[in-house]
Structure formats: structure tokens, C-alpha cells
């Protein structure tokens, strides 16, 4: 008769009994075809309830260690193919995780937004109301392109803010632009050559390459990406950020925009991916119209995100597809689920449609404008003109500062990091072979502490000049 000590377990008795019997089967102590005691007999022998034995037997039968024969009882199954592998009590895993953000570092390179200005009370109010009013919709599966209400709100916002006349059905919502880039590769094909701006975000080319697409960096001139070099690369897809390029800050003039459209119109398989990231924060004058607004031949795919205008952790982005590509998307890729929760989609839809988003943008534009001037004033106070030069543009939340130093860019970065300051050179964003040091560094001011800026600038001055 089977005998086990079940008194040393902290969990349910049936689990302990199940483990004991399973171990005996795995180690060959109970042979294939051997008959097991009845539930009542084993329960009486172990001093437990019949239901405890029944639950243990059911678990073993469910996993294939035992089987039952009507009116004959329970038997051990043939588990001879199972290899007994003893798991170590403790094992040190060698998984190397990326380093976490060091919050003590004064980071001039971070593109995070100023979290202190997020409208928490309004967002919480809208989310509570959404949960109260939309119980059924919240628990329903979202359409693959996003809920209708959010797509309509985005279309209305694009019409009033960017002068774009788009149908809500052209809009595809996703959790972050990285996800949308991956969808675009699947939609446009891996047989195309994708070109990206150089210098630029390395992540964009990494995403294309991870999706098995050929991606080539194309050099920029003072007007943006070079159309002549796009032609030499034999590219079909041009991924650009014409409104405010990162990191150079270049705003593409209208003649270059028409030149790009002319290139795209030369072949049916050519498209422009217009990344309008950071376009909301133009400090002077009216926002520059996107290329899509002057596209008459459906050659532009427009992409934008709410991670800069609201907060970095709101992973809601969207793209606007030409009509024929929207049809192709729904025909071939509609099996993809929308990656944004319905809770966030309905809340953001109301945040936009009820005017809160426009008010927030206006308030943040004023806030960042003042912060920009404060940072520029601090730089002017800390550095004579001969020691540094600010290269700025009227839009976006960063500018470039050029130091008169003999130190290599890499050395500057390393020395300052040792003193708790993170500063990134423009050469850090070169996608092709690095050029000679330019001593130009990015000042991303959206999330820096303005009260500490003077102290940090003086440390920079003492370290590299």
C-alpha cells in the first residue's frame, strides 16, 4: 500500500499527493499497467478525505500519468519515454538585461516629456466616465484599425490642426510607431529598398532590418534628405521627418517636398513615409503643412504619435494610409488585433473630441516655449560666444549646441557621464561610417530640471573647455 508523509506541505493536500505519486511514476517505482488503490482505500491509509485522493488522481489522469477503466479501477500509464530531469534547487541565469535608466543622471538627451504637466485629473475623469458609459464596448474586441470614435477624433484633429482631409477609415491605430513600422513592411513588402535619413534614429532602420527589409541610410544636405541619393540607392520607400528632423532640426522647404513627390510619382511602387513626430511644438508662426496635404497621387503614408504631445508612456500612435493601401491593409492584414486597449482608445477619443487635447497642446507649447527661452538664456550666461554656438530651429523640443573644444566627441560624452551628465553628440546618430567630430551636441530640454540647468552647464564648461 502506498504511504506518503503529507504533513510537511504548506499547500493543498491533493497537490502534495499528486507530486508524490508523479515522482514515483517518473522514477519507475510505480510500473506501467500497475493497478492503483481505490480512492477510498488510499484515503483511509493516508488519513485524508476521499476528495483529496480524487483530485490528485484527476490531475494525474489529465496529465497522462494514469488512466481509469470503468468498473476496474485506476492504472499507471506507460510513461517510459519520459526522462527524469532533476531541476537544480537554484540556478543563476545568464540573461543580460539592458541597463535601467539612472534617474540621478542629468540627461540632456532624453526625449521624455515633462510629466508634471500631464492632465491627470481630466484623464482620470474621462476614464471613469468611459468605464461607466461604455461597459459593453470596453469588453468587446476592438476593430483591427482602432475603434471608430478614436479614428473620427483623430481625423477631425488632423483637419483642424494640420489641414489634412482624411477619412477615418484611412487611419490605423497602434501601440507605438515601432509597431506601425512593422505593419508597413508587411503591407509594402520586403522586396523593396527602404531608405532612411542619415543622421537619424537608429531604431527605425533596426526595425526595418528586423522585419527582413533592406534598409539604406541616405545622407542629408541643408534642405533634408537628398533626392539624388535616394535615386542612386534605387530605393522605393523613403522614410523622412520633414517638419522637424532629428537630430539636425532641419525643416524641409517646400521645393524639396515637391521634388520628393515627383520622385515618388515616377513609379507605382514608390512611397513616402512621413513621420510627423514632434510637429505640434512649433514655437513661432503656424504649423508647417505636411507633405500629405500637397500629395495629389496618394504617395504619402503619414505617421504620428501621442507620446510626445501627451506623455512618453501613452503608447498610442496612428498612420494615415492612401485609400488603395487602406483597402489592401484590411484585405491582407485585418487578422492583426489592434494593440491599444479599448479603455485607452475611448478615453483618448473623448479627450480629443471634447477639446481637452487642443487646450493641452496650447498650454504645453507655451510651457515649452518659456522653458526653451530659459535654457537658451542660461547657456548665454554661462558661455561666451566664442566658446559655444547654439544652432536652433523654431520647432521641436530640442536644439543643437556646438562647443569650441579640442576634445573628441566620444571623450566629451565619457567625461561628462562620469560627472553625472549625459550629453550626446550628433555623430552618435550617424548611420553610415562616422564622420569627423563636429563638436555638436543635442540639448533635449523637454524633461530637464530648469532649476539645475546653470549648475550642470558650469560643470560642462569646466570639464571640456
Which stretches of residues belong to each language-model region?
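Short, conserved active-site loop motifs that form the nucleotide-linked donor/cofactor pocket
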Residues: 270, 300, 387-388, 421
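Conserved core segment of the aminotransferase class I/II
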Residues: 296-366
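Conserved core of the PLP fold type I
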Residues: 127, 137-269, 280, 286-294, ...
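A generic "structured core" feature
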Residues: 154, 198-207, 260, 271, ...
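Short glycine-rich anion-binding loops that position phosphate/pyrophosphate groups of nucleotides
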Residues: 113, 243-245, 308
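Residue-level signal for well-ordered alpha-helical positions
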Residues: 79, 187, 207, 284, ...
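N-terminal basic, amphipathic alpha-helical segments
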Residues: 1-128, 139, 324, 334-341, ...
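Walker B catalytic acidic pair
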Residues: 275-276
Amino acid at each position: 500500500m502506498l504511504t506518503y508523509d503529507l504533513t510537511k506541505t504548506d499547500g493543498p493536500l491533493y497537490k502534495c499527493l499528486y507530486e508524490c505519486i508523479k515522482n514515483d511514476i517518473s522514477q519507475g517505482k510505480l510500473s506501467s499497467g500497475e493497478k492503483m488503490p481505490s480512492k477510498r482505500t488510499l484515503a483511509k491509509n493516508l488519513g485524508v478525505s476521499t476528495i483529496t485522493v480524487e483530485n490528485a488522481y484527476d490531475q494525474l489522469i489529465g496529465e497522462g500519468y494514469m488512466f481509469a477503466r470503468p468498473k476496474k479501477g485506476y492504472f499507471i500509464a506507460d510513461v517510459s519515454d519520459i526522462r527524469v530531469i532533476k531541476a537544480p534547487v537554484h540556478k543563476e541565469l545568464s540573461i543580460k538585461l539592458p541597463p535601467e535608466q539612472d534617474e540621478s543622471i542629468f540627461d540632456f538627451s532624453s526625449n521624455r516629456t515633462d510629466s508634471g504637466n500631464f492632465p491627470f485629473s481630466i484623464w482620470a475623469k474621462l476614464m471613469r466616465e468611459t468605464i461607466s458609459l461604455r461597459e459593453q464596448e470596453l469588453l468587446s474586441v476592438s476593430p483591427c484599425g482602432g475603434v471608430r470614435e478614436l479614428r473620427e477624433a483623430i481625423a477631425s484633429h488632423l483637419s483642424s490642426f494640420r489641414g489634412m482631409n482624411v477619412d477615418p477609415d484611412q487611419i490605423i491605430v497602434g501601440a507605438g510607431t515601432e509597431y506601425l513600422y512593422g505593419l508597413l513592411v508587411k503591407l509594402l513588402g520586403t522586396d523593396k529598398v527602404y531608405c532612411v535619413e542619415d543622421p537619424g534614429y537608429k531604431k527605425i532602420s533596426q526595425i526595418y532590418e528586423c522585419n527582413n527589409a533592406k534598409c539604406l541610410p541616405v545622407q542629408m544636405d541643408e534642405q533634408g534628405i537628398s533626392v539624388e541619393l535616394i535615386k542612386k540607392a534605387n530605393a522605393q520607400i523613403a522614410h523622412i521627418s520633414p517638419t522637424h528632423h532629428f537630430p539636425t532640426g532641419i525643416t524641409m522647404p517646400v521645393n524639396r517636398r515637391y521634388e520628393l513627390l515627383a520622385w515618388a510619382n515616377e513609379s507605382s511602387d514608390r512611397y513616402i513615409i512621413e513621420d510627423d513626430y514632434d510637429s505640434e511644438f512649433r514655437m513661432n508662426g503656424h504649423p508647417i503643412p505636411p507633405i500629405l496635404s500637397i500629395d495629389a497621387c496618394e504617395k504619402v503614408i503619414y505617421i504620428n504619435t501621442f507620446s510626445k504631445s501627451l506623455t512618453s508612456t501613452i503608447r498610442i500612435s496612428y498612420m494615415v494610409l492612401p485609400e488603395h493601401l487602406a483597402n489592401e491593409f484590411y484585405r491582407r492584414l485585418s487578422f492583426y488585433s489592434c494593440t491599444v486597449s479599448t479603455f485607452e482608445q475611448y478615453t483618448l477619443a473623448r479627450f480629443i473630441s471634447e477639446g481637452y487635447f487642443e487646450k493641452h497642446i496650447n498650454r504645453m507649447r507655451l510651457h515649452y516655449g518659456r522653458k526653451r527661452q530659459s535654457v537658451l538664456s542660461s547657456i548665454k550666461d554661462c558661455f561666451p560666444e566664442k566658446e559655444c554656438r547654439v544652432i536652433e530651429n523654431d520647432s521641436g523640443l530640442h536644439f543643437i549646441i556646438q562647443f569650441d573644444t579640442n576634445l573628441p566627441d566620444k571623450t566629451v560624452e565619457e567625461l561628462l557621464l562620469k560627472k553625472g551628465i549625459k550629453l550626446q553628440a550628433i555623430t552618435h546618430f550617424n548611420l553610415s561610417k562616422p564622420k569627423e567630430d563636429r563638436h555638436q551636441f543635442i540639448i533635449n530640454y523637454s524633461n530637464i530640471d530648469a532649476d539645475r540647468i546653470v549648475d550642470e552647464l558650469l560643470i560642462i564648461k569646466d570639464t571640456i573647455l
